[in-house]
A protein has these predicted regions:
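Active-site beta-loop-alpha junctions enriched in small/polar residues
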Residues: 149, 180-182
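Charged helix-capping and loop-helix junction motifs
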Residues: 158-163
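A short helix->loop->beta-strand "cap" motif at the edges of active sites that frequently abuts
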Residues: 170-174
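Conserved small/polar residues in nucleotide/adenosyl-binding loops
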Residues: 185-187
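Active-site flanking residues adjacent to catalytic metal/cofactor-binding acidic residues
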Residues: 13, 177-179
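Conserved N-terminal subdomain of the carbohydrate kinase-like
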Residues: 54-148
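Glycine-rich phosphate/adenosyl-contacting loop at the front of the ribokinase-like
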Residues: 2-85, 127
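Surface-exposed amphipathic alpha-helices with a cationic face
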Residues: 49, 165-169
């Protein structure tokens, strides 16, 4: 393992936004929602970044999208660095960031999550999107974290995760893998 590294942990991820009604209100009863940038993988990075460790999210963004701007600002606020190409949206039916609606539940009402991932830009992640030699070889990464969610998202993300794991091994980076099973997720 490399003795010095810039990033304690890095991960490939598909960023999106989650909206949640305030005060545990049911989704169908609310017209106000709290919006946050989120992904399963950056939730893992959040722990290390909160402890002052430098972290890196490897992702893609929709060029010119206010949602992409929001995501970048939220990642900066969480002390998470990011790298990712800015991809043209390609019209109203083109690429976008994932969008999910969360009901926190209350009393007998269980928490629920509805995902909308059609046209998700993160589904197109590729190893060619990143300067692997610079990230792993020059800057250094302590741990590459992979999630079953990003690995299973598309053929492209599967190939990207496998290539990143091989690169991590080549440069002496530890690899962690979280199956991240969610019975209610619909990809």
């Amino acid at each position: 393992m490399k003795k010095t590294y810039q990033y304690a942990i890095a991960c490939p991820t598909s960023m999106g936004v989650r909206i949640t009604p305030p005060e545990r209100m049911a989704v169908q009863n609310s017209n106000l929602f709290y919006m946050q940038a989120t992904s399963a993988e950056t939730n893992v990075l959040n722990v290390a970044s909160s402890l002052g460790r430098e972290c890196l999210a490897l992702t893609k963004f929709v060029k010119g999208s206010p949602v992409a701007d929001f995501i970048k600002r939220q990642l900066r606020a969480r002390n998470i660095r990011f790298e990712g190409l800015n991809i043209e949206q390609g019209g109203p039916w083109g690429y976008r960031h994932q969008f999910n609606i969360a009901d926190s539940g209350f009393g007998l009402r269980a928490p629920r999550l509805w995902n909308d991932r059609t046209g998700e830009v993160g589904r197109t992640l590729s190893i060619e999107d990143f300067d692997v030699e610079r990230i792993f070889g020059q800057e250094g990464v302590g741990i590459l974290h992979l999630s079953g969610l990003i690995a299973a998202m598309s053929h492209e993300t599967t190939e990207c995760c496998l290539a990143l794991a091989k690169a991590a091994k080549q440069y002496g980076t530890l690899v962690s893998f979280d199956l991240n099973y969610l019975s209610l997720i619909h990809i």
